[in-house]
Amino acid sequence: MTEISSMVISHKKAKIEEMESAWHGDLDGLLNNLYHHEYVYECVVLKTCNRVEIYVVSPKSSSVLFSFAKEMGASTHIIDFYGHDESLEHLLRLAGGLESMIVGEDQILGQIKDLYAYSKKAGTTGKILDTAFEKAIQVGKRIRNETRINKGSVSIGSAAVDLAEDIFGGLTGKSVLVIGAGEIGVLVAKALAEKDIEAIYIANRTFKKAEEIAYELGGYAVRLDDIRGHLPDADVVISGTGAPHYILTREMIEEALDGRERKLLLIDIANPRDIEESVAELENVELCNIDNLRVISERTLKMRKEEAKKAEAIIQEEIRLLNIQYKRQKADRLISELYRQVYDVRVREREKAVNRLSAYHTIGEIETEVLDDLTHSIVNKILAEPTKVLRQAAELGNEEFLDVVSRVFCLEKDKAKLEKINQAKFEQIEPGCAKEQAAVKEQTAVKEQAVVKEQAAVKD
């Protein structure tokens, strides 16, 4: 049976360097290599900083994916191999943000959209993967609309920015000084740059690093020794250097407050602390440290875990609907082919009738139209009940019944494989491979002749 299978290398089992070593070449190369495998009918590749995932539609999924894992040089201990049902559930969980390092993050949904669109444009997807990925994107949106799984701050850096917004009622027109251009400092600066602030100043021990970040964000670089001169103009100071001593002392803050009446918010995200604790005693100063931010972050994580339960319920509901959709698609394929065959007979027999009548009488447009309507109506009425029965059987999962109908009426004779050989593979073989093209043509002709003989035998 041709279904979806997948292999997943993610942050859950693999280190960053292991994921990087498993990824060779560009996306085009991997997609092309996958799609031109004899037993791969459709494929999509998802590649982000935290995962490499391959989805294929194949009648020999296990052997195909194991061979690709070996080809990629990836150790099987860092890979999860999923069958059809597991692949669908994983994909929907991924789109919903449940598989991310930070539960509920939004970036993954955009990445799925972009990478699916890339594969679709490359021509490596078909009805089965299109249905799965379109459903995943829809579910990702639904989860974010119906739950609060992506709300609140879960990192210390984002919590610092949210806290500043809460205290001031927004950061519009505020001047912010960020001290420290390490990982957290950069994240804070980037989050601040998205706000409508008046100015952002980046101070760092290595001035060149401060200049690079400031240039990227449209801010101003400050030497660490010069921060004293910038404190009087700052509304918010966020410090996270990790230095073994205080960066901001009480004496420095008192000097900055001289002649000033507006509030100064100090947020210390360093460990050990960058700001002397006694500054909290000063008027018009509010000091928050990493412990305050951790409480906000943990509260958000707890909330997101609760929201994840709601997301799980949505996913289970959508998987049920997706399986019904796949079952209907199988019935629709059979019904479409059945109608096509019967309509071919209808057209041929109608033409015979018109020719016979024309031998004895003059047949005009009205008579021809009556015959056309008559045969059309007969076909539709004969097939109405079988159509209903086929759809019901599909929704009930009665695969055996569908297979019997398919064999009796010769509706599916390895159709997907013939189409793949005939269209995709032949058309995409590189120029100059005349022998390969001839071989494909010969294989296709042999198989098509076998199909015609099979149809003729059944009709006889």
Curated annotation (Swiss-Prot):
The active site is at C49. GO terms for biological process: protoporphyrinogen IX biosynthetic process from glutamate. It catalyses: (S)-4-amino-5-oxopentanoate + tRNA(Glu) + NADP(+) = L-glutamyl-tRNA(Glu) + NADPH + H(+). SUPFAM superfamilies: Glutamyl tRNA-reductase catalytic, N-terminal domain (SSF69742), Glutamyl tRNA-reductase dimerization domain (SSF69075), NAD(P)-binding Rossmann-fold domains (SSF51735). Pathway: Porphyrin-containing compound metabolism; protoporphyrin-IX biosynthesis; 5-aminolevulinate from L-glutamyl-tRNA(Glu): step 1/2. One of its GO terms (molecular function) is NADP binding. Gene3D superfamilies: Glutamyl-tRNA reductase, N-terminal domain (3.30.460.30), NAD(P)-binding Rossmann-like Domain (3.40.50.720). NADP(+) binds at G180, A181, G182, E183, I184, G185. The keyword Oxidoreductase applies. Substrate binds at T48, C49, N50, R51, S100, E105, D106, Q107, Q111. Its EC number is 1.2.1.70. The record marks H90 as: Important for activity. The keyword Transcription regulation does not apply. PROSITE patterns: GLUTR (PS00747). Keywords: NADP, Oxidoreductase, Porphyrin biosynthesis. PANTHER family: GLUTAMYL-TRNA REDUCTASE (PTHR43013:SF1). Possesses an unusual extended V-shaped dimeric structure with each monomer consisting of three distinct domains arranged along a curved 'spinal' alpha-helix. The N-terminal catalytic domain specifically recognizes the glutamate moiety of the substrate. The second domain is the NADPH-binding domain, and the third C-terminal domain is responsible for dimerization. Belongs to the glutamyl-tRNA reductase family. Homodimer. Catalyzes the NADPH-dependent reduction of glutamyl-tRNA(Glu) to glutamate 1-semialdehyde (GSA). During catalysis, the active site Cys acts as a nucleophile attacking the alpha-carbonyl group of tRNA-bound glutamate with the formation of a thioester intermediate between enzyme and glutamate, and the concomitant release of tRNA(Glu). The thioester intermediate is finally reduced by direct hydride transfer from NADPH, to form the product GSA. This is Glutamyl-tRNA reductase. The gene is hemA.
